[in-house]
């Protein structure tokens, strides 16, 4: 049987030999769509020099019905918010007959660009739950495995070309919460959240700021903590440090998530201040643990298990549609007004 050459593939596709050679080497100088077409044709023709990485990539896109292994990468996050997302991922993978490989990435591994050994095996897709450094993401992308991200860096453009991105709507929901505080007569409204960490927290701040500006209120930077914090304000001492820098106590504090809100409420209680009588507090995430804390927290319901399922659904779609443009998908949320923001202030005050 005649050996299939690069020239044979080029002739079949009416492409130049140089273009085909680059495509078979998975070169970024050739468009994604062209690489896929060339690799697929070469495989069908029996071209024997496809690299293992490229061959693996081809198999992912053409043996959709085989049992797939999906790798989930995440930091060992402090918040319980992530547990139910992983449960949703697991349930949806089971529904699709897929195997789950869950990998916790340590701070040291991320810093040293150490990837899980799982990625060296036959993996069909990756779900990334944490916002890793650009350098670490670049290492992952070298495996040419389809990726779906939950959330993104504050500068979302850093990863839009790498894979599909699922983002919980944050801007409008936080604007709605802040507007409600304003309508209740509050004007001195603070914010706590590390906007350098991820897009959703950045969007939450923009929603908060937008509500103030539309109401003719200038945001007071003295009661706004958006700086980089080592654990993104997931530790009480970081929240306490931020609050201790406030020159005065705001009428309300809008928090980027429920964990921050909990630490704020505990801090206020330690200072003899009451929520919402003295200070209104709001969160985001609607974590189950907050249902045991009084006063009940005004927050945003994400639907974590549903979100986990949605990540898998997007990855399954991507495996079947590899050459479609990458997508950024916003998932709807629900604002829940509760007792923690129910105070009203006379505008005359």
Roles of regions detected by a PLM:
Residues 175-217, 327-342:
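An alpha-beta-alpha
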Residues 240-349:
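Flexible loop/turn connectors
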Residues 188, 219-223, 275-280:
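Short acidic capping loops at alpha-helix termini that bridge into adjacent secondary structure
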């Amino acid at each position: 049987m005649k050996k299939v050459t690069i020239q044979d593939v080029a002739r079949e596709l009416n492409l130049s030999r140089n273009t085909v050679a680059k495509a078979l080497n998975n070169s970024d100088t050739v468009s994604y769509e062209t690489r896929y077409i060339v690799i697929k044709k070469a495989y069908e023709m029996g071209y024997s020099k496809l690299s293992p990485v490229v061959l693996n990539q081809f198999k992912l896109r053409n043996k959709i019905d085989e049992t797939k292994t999906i790798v989930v990468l995440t930091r060992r996050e402090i918040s319980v918010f992530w547990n139910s997302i992983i449960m949703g991922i697991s349930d949806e993978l089971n529904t699709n007959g897929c195997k789950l490989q869950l990998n916790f990435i340590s701070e040291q591994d991320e810093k040293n660009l150490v990837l899980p050994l799982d990625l060296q095996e036959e993996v069909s897709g990756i779900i990334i739950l944490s916002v890793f450094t650009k350098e670490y993401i670049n290492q992952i992308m070298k495996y040419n495995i389809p990726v779906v991200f939950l959330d993104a860096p504050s500068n979302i453009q850093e990863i839009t070309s790498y894979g599909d991105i699922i983002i919980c709507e944050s801007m409008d929901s936080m604007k709605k919460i802040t507007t409600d505080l304003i309508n209740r007569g509050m004007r001195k409204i603070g914010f706590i959240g590390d906007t350098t960490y991820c897009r959703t927290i950045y969007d939450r701040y923009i929603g908060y700021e937008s509500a103030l500006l539309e109401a003719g209120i200038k945001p007071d930077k003295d009661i706004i903590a958006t700086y980089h914090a080592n654990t993104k304000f997931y530790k009480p001492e970081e929240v306490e440090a931020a609050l201790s820098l406030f020159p005065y106590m705001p009428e309300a504090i809008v928090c980027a998530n429920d964990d921050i809100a909990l630490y704020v409420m505990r801090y206020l209680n330690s200072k003899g201040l009451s929520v919402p009588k003295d200070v209104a507090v709001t969160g985001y995430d609607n974590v189950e643990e907050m249902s045991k804390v009084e006063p009940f927290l005004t927050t945003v319901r994400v639907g974590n298990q549903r979100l986990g399922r949605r990540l898998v659904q997007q990855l399954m779609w991507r495996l079947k549609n590899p050459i479609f443009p990458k997508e950024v998908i916003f998932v709807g949320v629900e604002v829940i007004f509760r007792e923690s923001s129910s105070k009203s202030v006379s505008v005359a005050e």
